[in-house]
A protein has these predicted regions:
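Short, charged alpha-helical interaction segments and adjacent helix-coil junctions
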Residues: 2-3, 80-85, 185-293
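Conserved single-residue anchors adjacent to enzymatic active/cofactor-binding motifs
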Residues: 1-223
Length: 293
């Protein structure tokens, strides 16, 4: 039977945002971010029907994601964004920083939701944290696989806190391909599971449960079909993009040959000489001459 990694879009969402996955989500955030919340709930809960609607909407728009975005809200109103990015692309750090800033400003002015009676919209702002899972080297292969970035005082390295003694912003990155990580630490177990789909005997019970939940053989038939359809669509889309790139390269090479041929013709070379140098046939060269007249 075909196997799929837990980083597959549907499986990653199910693992962290299904109604019975709250304890897995909470442990995942604690192990990677280093903060233990009393409660943590996803903004959008995973259900196969809502996921199908989400996928069909993106499919109609021609969007084929290589990343998974999850937003979770804690009991204190803080927001944690979780992204699983399987492919490297330009400006990744800028993008995740933008998402973090958006998560921070999301509660601005929402005094009712924050329970804050102060007549000041800034008092409604809550901390924002970002967790980014990457299947590539972002900071270099010899850097630590798990990296956290905080707002710190330049001299004392003390974190910048809000009034309620909460850190303002934290960005966390876990590379699945970087080997510089403490063996058998909670983060190591997550890295091993997400990268291979397997768990060791010493893995925490919640990671073992995450494996059972995301095992393809344990999925409902509807979920299995959805995953296979999505992966097939991605493969077709990827092949089309690859073909378009090759076609563009070929077209570019032909245009370069034509430009070179015209230069040779203008300085008095014969059609036969230009054909031998550029590889263009005589008829094509004559056509180029006529177009220049």
């Amino acid at each position: 039977m075909q196997t799929y990694l837990p980083t597959t879009d549907l499986l990653f969402r199910k693992m962290l945002t299904a109604p019975d996955s709250l304890h897995i989500l909470k442990a995942f955030v604690k192990d990677l971010l280093g903060i233990e919340f009393q409660s943590l709930k996803p903004r959008e809960t995973y259900h196969i029907e809502t996921y199908k609607h989400f996928y069909e909407k993106n499919k109609r728009a021609g969007v084929f994601h290589t990343e998974v975005d999850i937003l979770a809200v804690a009991e204190d109103g803080s927001h944690t964004t979780i992204e699983c990015q399987v492919r490297s692309h330009p400006h990744f750090i800028e993008r995740v920083t933008y998402y973090l800033a958006e998560a921070f400003r999301a509660s601005y002015g929402n005094l009712t939701a924050s329970g804050d009676k102060k007549d000041n919209h800034y008092s409604s702002l809550r901390p924002a944290y970002g967790i980014n899972i990457m299947d590539f080297h972002l900071f270099g292969e010899n850097q630590k696989a798990l990296k956290r970035f905080h707002l710190l005082d330049e001299e004392t390295h003390a974190p910048l806190y809000l009034e309620k003694n909460k850190e303002l912003l934290i960005l966390c990155f876990l590379s699945l391909v970087n080997k510089n990580i403490e063996a058998h630490s909670p983060a190591w177990h997550w890295q091993y599971f997400l990268a291979t789909g397997e768990v060791t005997d010493s893995a925490p019970d919640y990671i073992k449960e995450a494996k059972v939940k995301t095992d393809f053989a344990n999925l409902k038939r509807e979920e299995q079909k959805m995953i296979m359809d999505i992966e097939k669509a991605k493969a077709i889309h990827g092949a089309e993009l690859s073909g378009a790139r090759l076609e563009g390269l070929q077209k570019g090479r032909e245009e370069a040959k034509c430009e070179l041929a015209l230069k040779f013709l203008k300085i008095g070379n014969t059609l036969e000489q230009v054909s031998e140098v550029t590889g263009l046939d005589i008829e094509t060269l004559r056509k180029l001459e006529r177009e220049q007249e």
